[in-house]
Amino acid sequence: MTDKNIIAGAPTEEPARQQYFMEQVKKLVEAESAKKGRPLTCFINTFGCQMNARDSEKLLGILKEAGYEEGTDENSDFVLYNTCTVRENANLKVYGRLGYLSGVKRKNPDMMIALCGCMRQEPEVVAKIKKSYRHVDLIFGTHNIFKLAELLYERFMEKKMVVDVWEGTNEIVEELPIERKYPFKSGVNIMFGCNNFCSYCIVPYVRGRERSREPEDIIKEIEGLVADGVVEVMLLGQNVNSYGKNLEQPITFAELLRRVEKIEGLERIRFMTSHPKDLSDELIETMKNSKKICSHLHLPLQSGSSEILKRMNRKYSKEQYLALVEKLRAAMPDISLTTDIIVGFPGETEEDFEETMDVVRKVRYDSAFTFIYSKRTGTPAAAMPNQIPEDVVKDRFDRLLKEVQDIASEVVKRHEGTVQKVLVEEIDTHEDSFVTGRLSNNTVVHFAGDASLIGKIVDVSLDEAKGFYYMGSLVK
């Protein structure tokens, strides 16, 4: 059958179309493998957030279904960079890796290099790749990762760079293969895109508008995961609190959580990220009454100054954020709160910075991701006046980091001497007679154990707090 006949014979409906192209690519991969006398390998390098990590599991699932074996490094036959573009230097990292790969490809001209993810959604980036990195074979974006097999087939046939970047889509393709990193826990996308347009953030421009999956599809996926041995799921979205608003039959995130809670065999439910402006009383009540939702909430602050929050377009004030924390603590006194904070946003004064420090002292976070403001081309904040001098930002960042770490080391101690449930995740990276796991509140615990414990929830005595983690002992 000719190439044209194969494409003409492809189903038009998804996911049948992609299943068809996976089969076609598999024939090509098997033929190449026979020629080389070894299996063709693939390697995915993932940059950025948990949404990207989950996307990479889907991409790897497609590649393995299409006949590739997973390789260990960039010397593989098919190398894919799933990119992040939240910060400008994330782009520079990828350009650096592409420069390195040009040498690798000279030695192995049959290898293929692909780029996808948020960085690919920027037209100027795609133009630069096409001009300066001609050894790249495949470029696609965030909206059409499900089309990898079809695009790969096109590249095999055309033998030239394939570019397929969509500006936006409402399409969500279900039931494609996924290769999970962990057999006992999994991320689950419940929605895609973002409608918030924070003035410093590129995400709505590269991930598109909010699109929610149907609750039935989410439940079906989680039931399948549980049947396959998963005990913990992480529900993922740029702003999970907005889930369900754009569905034909609207549903709240709290209602979705209550449905997920009913799935037999599922032990733990996590979710991220929550936008403070959309955190409802219904959600707080659902968390309070749940036996499965973990005792942890990531609630990005970004700044403690109401003036800076206004410029960031965050749509809440310092006072509203603190009132929300008060509600959460009243409902769940033991809840672990973590956050994101940006230092040095344009126009931030010393007084604004002290407002942030004040919130940190009042909330007492278990941990915080702290960032120096990074001017992001294409966002309103990049053009704002009063960009802060580097030395001032560095000084504030160091002061904030010390405050966060000092408080966190005190807060984490609160369970010292108690026995808690721990989901064991892996062999300890520093001591192979120990294992590492997490409490419901996401704190890491190290204790003596072996691989037979991985994936199990066990009782552990938290013997000693060591800053951000515990040393413990298994309760037999």
Regions found by a protein language model. Name each.
Residues 2, 383-476:
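Terminal RNA-binding accessory module
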Residues 45, 203, 236-238, 272-274, ...:
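Generic beta-strand/beta-sheet core signal
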Residues 181-184, 194-196, 293, 303, ...:
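Short flexible coil/turn linkers enriched for glycine and charged/polar residues
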Residues 1-236, 241-243, 282, 297, ...:
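Proteins enriched for Cys/Gly/acidic motifs involved in redox and nucleic-acid/cofactor modification
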Residues 49, 244-265, 312-315, 375-406:
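Radical SAM enzyme [4Fe-4S]-AdoMet core and its adjacent flexible, acidic
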Residues 198, 218, 235, 271, ...:
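Conserved, mostly hydrophobic/aromatic
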Residues 63, 129-130, 260, 287, ...:
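Hydrophobic C-terminal alpha-helix "anchor/cap" residues
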